[in-house]
Amino acid sequence: MEVSKLSSAFDIDLVFPEGFSFFEPYLQYFVREVLEIGGEAYVSRAFGGNISGLFIYDEFEKYGTVFTRSRKVFDYFCGLKPFNFLFAELKTEVESEVYDIYSIDLENRDIVHRFSHEISMADDGQLSEIERFMVLAHPEINRRWTRVALKNGDKCFTVRLDGEIAGLGWVSFVRGIGRIHSLFVKPEFRKLGIGEDILYARLLWLKSNRARFAFSEISRNNAPSSRIASKAQMRPCGQVFQYYMKSLVSNEPLKR
């Protein structure tokens, strides 16, 4: 196995074998994003030169994602960097948190919803406010991420109540495919239908931009988001597993 570090998303021909990853249309996008926020990316190749794995890593947040079907490659990348948690499509015997990948065919499905709240799309002028909200939602977040995401074309949809952001959610759009992610509603504004409105706003935006397909990774521990996705006729089509350093090092079940 040969492993090389990427200095640019475009400095290497990232041609992946068929069936390599559900996220294949997004892999080059993910590499670009992680490098622009100060992270690292590595690619492994098997004998013959075919790509066998991809690893992206954010030093600030101490998290990584391994894209591979090989346990050998998975184990190698797990030991490459210190991390608090790591995502992978590969299921192992090690305890993990399961995320279901919900998807929807936007070409052949109508999106109909009655909104309860006004939805806005954030712009660069709201960058500082969005950054502060993202830190509230994810205290360990790499603060470079918000600026990079907006620069690269991600859209942030917000709902305001009482003069402040009550909730927001992000959407990426790559190669005709939408990724719905990073929803957060402040606790005091939950159960008001904000999350549902933000989901439908993103689906409608994608459909208006002729997206063929959309997906979202949702933890099985997040019952409200799973219910909202199901109500929007999104259906599970795959899984991602979140591993924690303690479990991988000890190879024991995670104690919650």
Where in this protein do the model-derived segments appear?
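Short amphipathic alpha-helix that is part of the acyltransferase structural core
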Residues: 1-27, 108-141, 255-256
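N-terminal charged segments
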Residues: 1-82, 139
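Acyl-donor-binding surface of acyltransferase catalytic domains
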Residues: 48-117, 240-247
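Glycine-rich acetyl-CoA-binding "A-motif" of GNAT/NAT acetyltransferases
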Residues: 50-51, 164-167, 224
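A conserved beta-strand-loop-helix scaffold within acyl/acetyltransferase catalytic domains
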Residues: 57-59, 138-187
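Conserved active-site alpha-helix within GNAT-family acetyltransferase domains
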Residues: 76, 89-97, 196, 220-238
